[in-house]
Amino acid sequence: MKQKKLLYTGKAKSVYHTDEKGTLIVEFRDDITAFDGGKKDTLKNKGSYNAGVSAFFFSYLEKNGVKTHFLEMQDESRMAVRELSMIPLEVIVRNYAAGSIVRNYPFKEGTPLKPPVIVIDYKDDSRHDPMLNDELIVALKLATPAELKKIKAIALKINTLLSGLLAKQGITLVDFKLEFGRQGTTIYLGDEISMDSMRLWDKKTGESLDKDVYRFNKGDVMATYNRVAARITKPQKPAAAKKKAPVSKKTVKRTR
């Protein structure tokens, strides 16, 4: 597969046409931003960490029945994906109160949200991604009621799958952002799932394991990304088979 003309460039990713119809290449760059681009830097290897984690999550979700745009990795920072007609919505699933929900509502940070709260924002930097309700989404013709229902169901399924997966690695999935697109009438998960788009806390220490480290100057963000990427993608050990209790000689004699 050959990478062709640039189609789109965002804050931290670039999307390219390819010589295969219906397939694009997403390049995860080493750029990192916060506060609508008000804070930005370029950090070596950041793109490869996010690409690797995204590929890992996409593959895991595909195995568990979630359709994603991911096809295969091209190298450590580029992946081939299905070309989708993206829906300009950011779907945020919140399991614990943190970030903007604490600033805007009377929640204490770390409060469990049961059931999980789904917030949908209009993906538009010029308007600072305003929050939408279902009626506004339909009125703006961004998605149909049936598509919205489907998107929310997929988001909750992803939340269940990833919360369980991360818990095994001692990580709490606080909240995360998803983006979806269409191919025909089918809804696919697009964009990325990485430390840039998730809020993760260490279960034991409460330490931030995501872009908040960069956002709020909590430490070395690249050391964090490196450590978290290795932790998330670490192969799962199969459950140990239960050992059968040894049969005593007395039991053998009684059964003869």
Curated annotation (Swiss-Prot):
GO process annotations (BP): 'de novo' IMP biosynthetic process; cobalamin biosynthetic process
Coiled-coil regions, chain positions: none
Keyword set includes rRNA processing: no
Alphabetized SUPFAM superfamilies for the sequence: SAICAR synthase-like
Enzyme Commission code: 6.3.2.6
Compositionally biased residues, Basic residues: 240-256
Residue ranges of the region described as Disordered: 234-256
Reaction equation(s) it catalyzes: 5-amino-1-(5-phospho-D-ribosyl)imidazole-4-carboxylate + L-aspartate + ATP = (2S)-2-[5-amino-1-(5-phospho-beta-D-ribosyl)imidazole-4-carboxamido]succinate + ADP + phosphate + 2 H(+)
Record-level Gene Ontology MF annotations: ATP binding; phosphoribosylaminoimidazolesuccinocarboxamide synthase activity
Pathway listed: Purine metabolism; IMP biosynthesis via de novo pathway; 5-amino-1-(5-phospho-D-ribosyl)imidazole-4-carboxamide from 5-amino-1-(5-phospho-D-ribosyl)imidazole-4-carboxylate: step 1/2
InterPro entries attached to this UniProt entry: SAICAR_synt/ADE2_N, SAICAR_synt_PurC, SAICAR_synth, SAICAR_synthetase, SAICAR_synthetase_CS
Keywords, ordered alphabetically: ATP-binding, Ligase, Nucleotide-binding, Purine biosynthesis
Record bears the keyword ATP-binding: yes
PROSITE patterns per UniProt: SAICAR_SYNTHETASE_1 (PS01057), SAICAR_SYNTHETASE_2 (PS01058)
Alphabetical list of Pfam families matching this protein: SAICAR_synt (PF01259)
HAMAP family per the UniProt record, alphabetical: SAICAR_synth
Family: Belongs to the SAICAR synthetase family.
Designated name of the protein: Phosphoribosylaminoimidazole-succinocarboxamide synthase
